[in-house]
């Protein structure tokens, strides 16, 4: 921007007439406009009135001739606005910008954006005036700001100079547009179209957040971190101000209490997007279809940040009945299955969220079964977050449709869960046990027999891993074991030692599975964890001790005793090396107190 001296109207006129650019014999239209703007600094009210009349007349009559001159005029208005004190004169100067925007929207907005990154009260007042302008002007300005907002910023690009401006090709323009929109949204006098424009701005403000979290250098300096934090804060402010424009802002804000911090966090950004999308569907009925029309093109043609944000919106909005019915089912499931097979863990994680929302609308048993079977392979995913989400989604589906799921699907889920009941990863162990418990609770009494074998197979795993040093994991197994005891009707003998009671029940009531129980325990004697090996040895000893009360034939009892009593003691047995990673995952760190029987508190 050119540097202007602080001169009065007459001096400005003389200076202006000597400038080579304007050597015409008659004053140009631009020159007259600049002279009128400078005259607004006069303290004499008559001079101000004359300048106002002249300026408005020129802009209304000659604005078609100003193409290419708008940036210069905007610079002059901003320069003199900082010195204009008279409220009426300021109003005229700011009104001149609105008149320019009516005919030259793109040039006006672009010129103002170059002054908006380091925004002062003068620029703020100009944006507020544009937000309050008559509808055609206001809508044109908002549309142009949205167009700029859609661009990708780059913080490593050119920074604004001391005068607050930056070059035409600067990638900081989207950040300036964010600030301008924030000013307009905060002003209650500004009217915002609550339709597809509202949806578009929300989506691209959220995408701007994603850009900001990914556009810093690999080793940003302290100044870069501060600048990025400020830009993120400004974008969040704009988003909050826009959400408050809803008819029920308080209800929406209450539901979004936990999402604002998530949106500002690189690690949890997409969780925040999911919460925001759900809140929009719940509190702003009728916008869900508008969201889909904006999101779907980004799914197929957006850059990485746009696509991920669009995927989060897409999966969250599948919870809406109206939006689910608009799209064809095979299109939705096709997208989700493609994402589930993608090499990117985030894609797989989002696909599971989408499948969980699709399940809300399914009533057909076959469709539910196919969906659940499609989720089950995610239990073996390499990413922990994907595994946790798969278990959480299946839990919600089972709880919601417990009376509409085939029993064989229940059996398959519980069978696939068993290795994870004693997994070495505490979060996965807790999630697996929580799902296991809920599935047992949600099972119809008439269907219990079909699941009995799977419950029995889980008892040894749970019993031998009760003393995990991770207390939450250990507690989750104790809770699962209690549910198993209730399921099998083993609650009558609570006055007996729990370990002994369980072994007695297994021997008396399930003699045909004793070999299977002992084989399981024998596998655990190869665990790399000392206390798991100790527990396995003690379990075998306890089962063998109670064999006399078994309905088995004496020859079968003798065979079991001969086969399983020949193990060396724990002190004599070397610690084995287990080369198979799949087998190692079955074991977790367990900590047993070495006693003949475990106290009731452990069960």
Question: Which residues does each predicted region cover?
Answer:
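Eukaryotic modular interaction domains in large regulatory/scaffold proteins
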Residues: 306-307, 348, 438, 501, ...
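Hydrophobic residues within the alpha-helices of tandem HEAT/HEAT-like
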Residues: 54-62, 93-102, 126-135, 149, ...
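Alpha-helical repeat/alpha-solenoid scaffolds of the HEAT/ARM/MIF4G superfamily
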Residues: 182-279, 287, 292, 490-494
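Alpha-helical solenoid scaffolds in large eukaryotic transport, assembly, and signaling factors
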Residues: 19-25, 42-47, 53-68, 95-101, ...
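Intrinsically disordered, low-complexity regions enriched in proline, serine, glycine
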Residues: 49, 63, 67-68, 90, ...
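HEAT/HEAT-like alpha-solenoid repeats
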Residues: 25-39, 65-81, 104-122, 145-150, ...
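Short coil/turn segments at helix-helix junctions and helix-capping linkers
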Residues: 20, 24, 35-49, 61-65, ...
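HEAT-repeat alpha-solenoid elements in large eukaryotic scaffold proteins
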Residues: 6-16, 45-58, 85-89, 117-126, ...
């Amino acid at each position: 921007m050119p540097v202007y001296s602080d001169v009065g109207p007459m001096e400005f006129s003389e200076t202006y007439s000597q400038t080579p650019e304007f050597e015409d014999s008659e004053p140009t239209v631009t020159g007259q406009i600049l002279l009128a703007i400078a005259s607004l600094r006069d303290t004499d009210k008559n001079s101000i009135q004359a300048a106002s009349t002249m300026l408005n007349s020129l802009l209304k009559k000659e604005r078609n001739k100003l193409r290419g001159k708008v940036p210069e005029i905007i610079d002059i208005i901003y320069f003199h606005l900082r010195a204009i004190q008279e409220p009426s004169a300021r109003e005229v100067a700011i009104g001149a910008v609105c008149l320019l925007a009516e005919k030259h929207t793109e040039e006006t907005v672009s010129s103002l954006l170059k002054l908006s990154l380091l925004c002062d009260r003068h620029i703020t007042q100009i944006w507020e005036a544009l937000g309050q302008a008559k509808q055609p002007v206001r809508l044109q300005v908002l549309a142009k700001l949205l167009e700029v907002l859609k661009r990708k910023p780059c913080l490593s690009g050119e920074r604004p100079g001391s005068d607050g401006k930056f070059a035409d090709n600067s990638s900081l323009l989207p950040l300036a547009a964010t600030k301008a929109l924030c000013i307009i949204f905060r002003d209650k006098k500004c009217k915002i179209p609550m339709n597809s424009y509202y949806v578009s701005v929300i989506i691209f403000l959220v995408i701007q957040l994603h850009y900001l979290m990914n556009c810093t250098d690999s080793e940003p300096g302290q100044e870069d971190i501060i600048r990025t934090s400020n830009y993120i804060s400004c974008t969040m402010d704009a988003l909050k101000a826009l959400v408050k424009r809803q008819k029920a802002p308080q209800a929406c804000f209450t539901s979004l209490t936990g999402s604002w911090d998530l949106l500002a966090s690189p690690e949890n950004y997409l969780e925040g997007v999911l919460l925001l999308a759900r809140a929009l569907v719940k509190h702003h009925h009728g916008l869900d279809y508008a969201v889909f029309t904006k999101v779907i093109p980004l799914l197929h043609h957006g850059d990485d940040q746009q696509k991920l944000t669009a995927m989060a919106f897409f999966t969250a909005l599948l919870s809406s009945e109206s939006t689910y019915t608009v799209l064809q089912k095979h299109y939705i499931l096709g997208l989700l299955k493609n994402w589930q097979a993608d090499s990117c863990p985030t894609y797989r994680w989002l696909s599971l969220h989408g499948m969980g929302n699709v399940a809300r609308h399914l009533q057909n048993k076959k469709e539910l079964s196919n969906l659940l079977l499609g989720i089950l392979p995610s239990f073996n995913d390499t990413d922990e977050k994907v595994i946790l989400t798969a278990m959480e989604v299946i839990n919600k589906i089972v709880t919601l449709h417990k009376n509409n799921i085939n029993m064989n699907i229940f059996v398959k889920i519980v069978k696939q869960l068993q290795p994870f009941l004693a997994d070495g990863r505490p979060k996965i162990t807790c999630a697996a046990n929580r799902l296991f418990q809920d599935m047992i609770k949600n099972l119809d009494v008439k269907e219990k027999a079909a699941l009995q074998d799977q419950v029995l197979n889980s008892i040894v795993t749970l019993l031998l891993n009760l003393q995990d040093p991770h207390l939450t994991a250990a507690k989750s197994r104790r809770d699962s074991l209690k549910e198993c005891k209730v399921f099998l009707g083993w609650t009558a003998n609570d006055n007996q030692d729990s370990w002994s009671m369980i072994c007695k029940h297994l021997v008396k009531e399930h003699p045909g599975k004793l070999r299977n129980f002992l084989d399981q325990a024998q596998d655990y004697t190869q665990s790399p964890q000392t206390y798991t090996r100790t527990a396995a040895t003690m379990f075998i000893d306890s089962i063998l001790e109670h064999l006399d009360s078994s309905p088995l034939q004496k020859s079968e009892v003798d065979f079991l005793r001969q086969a399983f009593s020949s193990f060396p003691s724990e002190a004599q047995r070397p610690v084995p090396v287990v080369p198979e990673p799949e087998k190692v995952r079955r074991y977790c760190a367990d900590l047993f107190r070495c006693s003949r029987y475990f106290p009731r508190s452990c069960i």
